[in-house]
Design a protein with these regions (language model features):
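PLP-dependent amino-acid enzyme catalytic core
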Residues: 1-295
């Protein structure tokens, strides 16, 4: 990916502008090849029927908008979603649902509370590596449908995040010095034990489940932005491993009739996206978890 580098005039943080940004219609076509409309439709129809589902708040920050001299600034509040206090509540849980559909059939998953299907699902184990948020969604989804869940976290993940995962019934295993190592260990253990990996990170030969994760994130933005007819000009997203940013971007381009500007925020000491853009190939970074890609308003 080619990019132009610019020095930020208000801070020491660099800005990178993607010089390969394609026209809106072409972007829509590319997105729909990777994430077809049917995947989003299925995700919305499924998630919107879950107990307690409702669109989460889009908060209008009038004071911030006035200070910046712009018309409006909105903050997407996902903390209230299903009581998880997580901005990634939808992706992992929906991927668990799709995984179970692939294993036992769609009709059986819909009937997951019947004794016969309960017993069938109870013999299935899903697993994932996480820094906290994705794993919480996977654990919550596993608990909702009744399957077992094993979550791998690396040595730097906080105790509070570990306890939050256990709250939803997951077996939590500390393994690896960083997230990438935890991902590899989760893959290995899944192969050894016939578990099913629910990852928001794709790799060679593994892309179907991450696409379901992204479809889940599409529902998040659809409910609060598209259905409420909010028309953003600029959208700021944390990068993480990329699935949330990709899912939100896909939902915007799928449902809007114009192209908003998408701004990705990378943590300074774990800037894998910035480095990957600079080197035009995927780059692994081993940064401190003290540096998170948060957007401060």
């Amino acid at each position: 990916m080619n990019c132009h580098y610019f020095k930020n005039q208000t801070s020491n943080r660099p800005l990178y502008f993607n010089s390969r940004r394609v026209p809106f219609n072409e972007a829509q076509t590319l997105i729909k090849k990777i994430l077809p409309d049917a995947g989003f439709t299925s995700a919305y129809e499924t998630i919107s029927k879950w107990p307690g589902y409702q669109p989460t708040s889009l908060i209008n920050l009038d004071n911030v908008a006035d200070a910046l001299g712009v018309k409006s600034v909105f903050y997407k509040n996902e903390a209230e979603r299903f009581g998880l206090k997580s901005f990634k509540a939808l992706g992992g849980a929906y991927a668990v649902h799709k995984c179970l559909e692939m294993l036992i059939g769609k009709n059986h998953v819909s009937d997951h509370k019947s004794p016969k299907i309960k017993k069938m699902i109870a013999g299935i184990t899903v697993t994932s590596a996480t820094d906290g948020n994705h794993g919480k969604s996977v654990a919550w989804g596993a608990k909702m449908f009744g399957c077992k869940c094993v979550i791998f976290i690396h040595e730097k993940v906080s105790k509070n995040r570990e306890y939050a995962l256990k709250k939803y019934g997951a077996q939590v295993v500390r393994a690896g010095k960083n997230y990438d190592e935890s991902v590899k260990i989760a893959q290995e253990k899944a192969k050894e034990n016939d578990w099913h990996v629910i990852s928001d990170t794709s790799y060679a030969g593994y892309s179907t489940i991450p696409k379901h994760v992204m479809n889940g994130y599409e529902v998040m933005i659809y409910g609060a932005v598209i259905k409420q007819r909010v028309r953003p000009t600029h959208v700021f997203l944390q990068t993480g491993v990329g699935s949330l940013a990709a899912g939100v971007t896909a939902s915007l381009f799928r449902n809007l009739d114009y192209s908003p500007r998408i701004i990705l925020v990378d943590p300074e000491n774990a800037d894998c996206w910035v480095q990957s853009i600079k080197h035009q190939e995927p780059v692994a970074c081993e940064g401190s978890l003290e540096n998170l890609s948060l957007i401060h308003i």
